[in-house]
Amino acid sequence: VTVLALDIGGTKFAAAAVTADGDVTARAEVPLSRAGSPDRALAQVVEQVTARVPADAIEGIGIGSAGPLDPRAGTVSPVNIPRWRDFPLTAAVGRMLPGRPVRLAGDAQCMALGEWWRGAFPEEPEKPGAAAPEPSAEAAAGPGEGPRRAGSRAVLGVVVSTGVGGGFVLDGVPYLGPTGNAGHIGHITVDPGGDPCPCGASGCVETVASGPAMVRWARAGGWTGADARALAASARAGSAIAQAAFRRAADALATAFHTAAALLDLDRVVVGGGVAAAGPILFDPLRQAMAENAGLGFTRRLRVDATSLGRDAGLLGAAALALPRRPPDTRPGAAPAVPE
């Protein structure tokens, strides 16, 4: 079984052919700055992949996109990509590869699902004699999006890049919400009097912790670099203002993560995206802020890790959306259905 996975981020459009074992057999990527119209960008990546994997071998299509999105209508409206607003993505893909099922979810939802399926979540041994918890209603009754990983029942995936997006995987099932937009953690308010956000609110996490927001703040303090990658390099070189920008972003992210953990009893947060590629410059102050601000006891067990799959996490999660499922096992303690 081979499926086509599509991943639309703030700066690039990626595609891959992925097998049921999670092997990537072909891939393509187009920078959105040079991609032209959405239809042209889609055509470029699909044509590059199908030049290496015959189109008739592709049995389904999974898409992860920056949001908001409308899975029922098949449209995407990424906040930071104006030309993609209300673009009928699933219909456009369906015209290129007719007759295949198409599934759409948020890019961070797919990243979390990809990590759950093929990533390196630390596994925690069960306590001796402990009974396995019953699966959630979604895991027992739903179609079974994604496999379960021991020790990580409730995962938040976060993409920190041009924007800040999020998505939940609970008991192996992406929780999408009634409109498909659950997990927009970048639009939790962390500073009510803060900068206006493109979403229409003010003081969102995204206005503090996204790459462009960090760069704007540092420049206001006298830094003269070009972008978030240069900001990370300056922080590593000892620039006080660059380091402060990362600490400020880390504080905002820690507040948002603790908020989500208090609501959903999370045990893992997996962070990816261009800003997360800064490594310890971001994760050291983030983990410090998490430790200093933990409140309720159960939130102190929350673990924050960088994605182990890098840029492939979103593609693998999108593939998992499209792969065939085994029927769910509804016995107590059974894992939800997984890709065959």
What residue spans do the PLM features occupy?
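Short acidic, glycine/serine/threonine-rich loops at helix termini
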Residues: 115-117, 169-170
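Glycine/small-residue-rich loop that forms an oxyanion/phosphate-binding "nest" at active or ligand-binding sites
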Residues: 103, 109, 113-115
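ATP-binding/phosphotransfer module of carbohydrate and carboxylate kinases, centering on a glycine-rich
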Residues: 1-60, 70-73, 91-101, 117-152, ...
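A charged helix-plus-loop insertion that forms the helical arch/lid used to bind
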Residues: 74-86
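Generic beta-strand structural signal
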Residues: 100, 153-158, 162-166, 170, ...
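Structural signature of FAD isoalloxazine-binding scaffolds in flavoprotein oxidoreductases
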Residues: 181-184
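Short beta-strand segments
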Residues: 7, 62-66, 105, 156-163, ...
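Residue-level detector of high-confidence beta-strand sites
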Residues: 27-29, 79, 113, 177
